[in-house]
């Protein structure tokens, strides 16, 4: 581990992205360390908060009870950088490709609550605050109530992937491994402000599903509705300039095929 990496602390490291960051060599800890006196080591210069409040997206969510507010207080008191893992959901229905300058007009509770937390922490931390608005991350995640997790469960259990939208619906998908690599690179020298994190590639959901089935070795894709719904792609120009990291359509589809093969083998530990 480099000295630079040692100056970063991943809190909420038990989640999907948190574990991936720790797997890249970043020190991690549960979010409970934020409540402990001296819990954040003296050598830390940057906190990446990778935890998620279980109430987020629900009516009973309270930002005062979200531990991310505690992380922000520690960062402000000690002059640390804080990297927030936000979501493309804060943009709502903004036209694609969505730039960081697009107005934030979230259309659901999750997006509205994420945006409210962004503004709350920005006011407190100023230039020491970096917001990463992340596209659709996918990994080997059967059992998770995510788009990709539900897709894997149904393929394994029923031999099919079922959509309630057109398979031509294009979205910005990014493999978990690439997401973690990009976040780590940005956290080594936090730029401040907003950075979109995604592939920047409008990939048809049907193509992603077919790649998973190719890896699995079988399966069928069925659709109960032909409506194109929630298409989006992020403009990742700033991410490219800051990290030098680029994704390709082939890399995304290869990751999906590998996940399908892993599902067939049944040997990996679910996320």
Residue ranges and their predicted role:
Residues 164-166, 172-271:
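C-terminal substrate-binding subdomain of Rossmann-fold SDR/epimerase-dehydratase oxidoreductases
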Residues 70-109:
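Conserved Rossmann-fold NAD(P)-dependent oxidoreductase catalytic core, especially the SDR/UDP-sugar
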Residues 67, 95-132, 136, 143-144:
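Catalytic helix-loop patch of NAD(P)-dependent Rossmann-fold dehydrogenases
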Residues 2-27:
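N-terminal Rossmann NAD(P)H-binding glycine-rich loop of SDR-like oxidoreductase domains
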Residues 119-170, 176:
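NAD(P)-dependent short-chain dehydrogenase/reductase
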Residues 36-77, 90:
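NAD(P)H-binding glycine-rich loop region in Rossmannoid oxidoreductase-like domains
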Residues 7, 45-46, 81:
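Structural motif
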Residues 11, 50, 82-88, 92, ...:
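SDR active-site strand-loop-helix element
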